[in-house]
UniProtKB/Swiss-Prot annotation:
GO molecular function: DNA binding; DNA-binding transcription factor activity
Cystine pairs: none
GO biological process: DNA-templated transcription; negative regulation of DNA-templated transcription; regulation of DNA-templated transcription; response to antibiotic; response to stress
GO terms under cellular component: cytosol
Pfam family, one: MarR
Matches recorded under InterPro entries: HTH_MarR-typ, Tscrpt_reg_MarR-type_CS, WH-like_DNA-bd_sf, WH_DNA-bd_sf
Organism phylogeny: Bacteria, Pseudomonadati, Pseudomonadota, Gammaproteobacteria, Enterobacterales
Organism: Escherichia coli (strain K12)
Designated name of the protein: Transcriptional repressor MprA
Length: 176
């Protein structure tokens, strides 16, 4: 069975055969990473949809669950999710509607609002996380522990390089 990446790889090989200065391996690796990320997101979104939630709501629940008291201010949630405060309010509204969080006044300052994960929210996470973890184990079982360590090291190295390029104002050219 051909990989879903085969058509892209064939196109790149064709381009490389016509242009001797074509940076085949660099473009191939970049496209492989992009293709894999797309497939990972597609798979994850299908799983989350089957569980009745989307990525944004799920990440908000995980963010709350990861806090010491399972509580966070809306502005902190906004920052953690990389979204606007308006969008964080919409997210909190949906989580509250589903009974997964409660809005509570701060013990120290009544003007300060906290989003608190409810028992129903904890219960939902206890339900949805095991199938997700199982799926991840299935995916990553294709690699040995050594290969996973190597991939992590290489990925971190490339991410550091991207961060440095961004700091230096270097923009990746459009993919050929």
């Amino acid at each position: 069975m051909d990989s879903s990446f085969t058509p892209i790889e064939q196109m790149l090989k064709f381009r490389a055969s016509r242009h001797e200065d074509f940076p085949y391996q660099e473009i191939l690796l970049t496209r492989l990473c992009m293709h894999m990320q797309s497939k990972l997101l597609e798979n994850r979104n299908k799983m989350l949809k089957a569980q009745g939630i989307n990525e944004t709501l799920f990440m908000a629940l995980i963010t709350l669950e990861s806090q010491e008291n399972h509580s966070i201010q809306p502005s902190e949630l906004s920052c953690a999710l990389g979204s606007s405060r308006t969008n964080a309010t919409r997210i909190a509204d949906e989580l509250e509607k589903r009974g997964w969080i409660e809005r509570r006044e701060s013990d120290n300052d009544r003007r300060c609002l906290h989003l608190q994960l409810t028992e129903k929210g904890h219960e939902f996470l206890r339900e949805v996380l095991p199938p997700q973890h199982n799926c991840l184990h299935q995916l990553w079982s294709a690699l040995s522990t050594t290969e996973k360590d190597q991939l992590e090291q290489i990925t971190r190295k490339l991410l550091s390089r991207l961060d440095q390029m961004e700091q230096d104002g270097v923009v990746l050219e459009a993919m050929s």
